[in-house]
Swiss-Prot record:
It comes from Xenopus laevis. The keyword Nucleus does not apply. Residues 1-24 form the signal peptide. The lineage of its organism: Eukaryota, Metazoa, Chordata, Craniata, Vertebrata. InterPro entries: FAM3, ILEI/PANDER_dom, ILEI_FAM3C. This is Protein FAM3C. The gene is fam3c.
């Protein structure tokens, strides 16, 4: 009897181990199958939805410009610390890195037909005089694209004559530009209408981002190429 009982016990253990083995093998197969399905789905998703970088447009603006237009991006200075930046057709014309900006109104002149840079300059309208700035404005050739950005203060020495000449370039906000306001503008010599490219942030102690200065004002867009004589 003892031998028969031992045999039954051994058979029971063997059946248990066999059952466990079969179940584990089936589970393992299913696991591999599931993992395979996951990898297959992942590969299909990668092919169907490939990762692509967002396109970069000229001057880093948010859209592509139409044909016969120049992309531009312009930013005023930040307080009296960081200078303005002017980019046209993917070329940085003025910036602190280029070391060609300064306190006052910073100006870049661009050929309206080719987009080529004509001149960059700045006029100190806080510690300097307005006379040289007026003479500069008088000599801008017709058909020239004019880009302007303030840094620190661009208004203290502005007089009616200077404001009138900037207004003739297409500005509508130059007459309200005041001490330490931030302002950016794109216009043209000989323009027949007011420019759509102008932004202004007033110096206001209650809303200023920096102590004594408003936040930086930025603007981007597409300037139509001058086609007619």
């Amino acid at each position: 009897m003892r031998i028969a009982g031992a045999i039954k016990f051994v058979v029971a253990v063997a059946l248990f181990l066999l059952t466990f083995y079969v179940i584990s093998q089936v589970f393992e197969i299913k696991s591999y199958t599931n993992l395979g399905n996951i990898f297959v789905r992942s590969a299909i998703d990668t092919v169907a939805h490939p990762t692509t970088k967002a396109p970069r447009y000229r001057c880093g603006i948010s859209k592509v410009c139409p044909e016969k237009h120049f992309a531009f991006k312009i930013a005023s200075g930040a307080a009296n610390v960081v200078g303005p930046k002017i980019c046209v057709d993917d070329n940085i014309l003025m910036s602190g890195v280029k070391n060609n900006v300064g306190r006052g109104i910073n100006t870049a002149l661009v050929n309206g037909k080719t987009g080529a840079l004509i001149e960059t300059t700045y006029h100190d309208l806080w510690g300097g005089e307005v006379g040289p700035f007026i003479e500069f404005l008088k000599k801008i050739p017709d058909g020239t694209i004019v880009l302007m950005a303030t840094y620190d203060d661009g208004a203290t020495k502005l007089n009616d004559d200077a404001r009138k000449r900037i207004s003739e370039l297409g500005s509508t906000l130059i007459n309200v530009l005041a001490f330490r306001d931030n302002w950016v503008f794109v216009g043209g010599k000989g323009i027949k209408t007011k420019s759509p490219f102008e932004q202004h942030i007033k110096n206001n102690k209650d809303t200023n981002k920096y102590e004594g200065w408003p936040e930086v004002v930025e603007m981007e867009g597409c300037i139509p190429q001058k086609l007619n004589e």
